């Protein structure tokens, strides 16, 4: 089964990909799927607090998702860009077969010094109960299409060295390891480049 379709969702063109029987897309949440988004974020936040896991992408955890309208307004950084920020687009990965959100990406439109060092163009993450099912690889593939639409020709993705699953997902999308650096938290981080 191989389906690829293109559709408009809240002004963001998003590809729908079936990969290993996955029917997923990167979308902007709306009132129609508010409950599914809150359920995912509640589960994810509980995992972060209980297991002290890395909150990635961090942007989706900066605001109270129960204040839904304000939450959606805060997700993206738009022009004019505040000092110390770059424009970003945050999209959530929706599985249409399961009717749930499974992850999120935060796409930085260009890199500043800090992002070039250890942040990259794409921050991504998969909700705890849906990890190790292939979603990350498929979601990154969709995020790379969004990067291409923004005119980005070479994408930097970074992950902590101990995050083997994330590294595999990046490599599965053509990531080539350039080097390892210490991030802002002094954690060893791998820097991968993907040519589009």
Region roles according to the model:
Residues 158-159, 174-191:
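Conserved catalytic-core motifs of GNAT/GCN5-like acyltransferases
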Residues 9-121, 186-196:
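GNAT-family acyltransferases
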């Amino acid at each position: 089964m191989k389906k690829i379709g293109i559709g408009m969702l809240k002004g963001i063109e998003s590809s729908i990909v079936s990969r290993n029987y996955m029917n997923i897309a990167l979308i902007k949440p709306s009132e129609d799927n508010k409950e599914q988004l809150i359920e995912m974020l509640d589960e994810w936040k509980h995992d972060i607090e209980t297991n002290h896991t890395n909150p990635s992408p961090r942007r989706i955890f900066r605001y109270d998702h129960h204040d839904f309208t304000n939450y959606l307004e805060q997700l993206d950084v738009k022009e004019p860009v505040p000092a110390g920020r770059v424009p970003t687009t945050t999209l959530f990965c929706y599985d249409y077969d399961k009717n749930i959100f499974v992850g999120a990406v935060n796409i930085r439109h260009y890199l500043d010094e800090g992002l070039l060092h250890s942040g990259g163009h794409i921050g991504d993450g998969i909700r705890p109960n849906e990890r190790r099912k292939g979603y990350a690889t498929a979601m990154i593939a969709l995020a790379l299409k969004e990067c291409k639409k923004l005119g980005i020709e070479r994408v930097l993705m970074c992950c902590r060295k101990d995050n083997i699953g994330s590294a595999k997902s990046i490599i599965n999308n053509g990531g080539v390891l350039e080097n390892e650096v210490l991030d802002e938290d002094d954690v060893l981080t791998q820097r991968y480049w993907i040519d589009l």
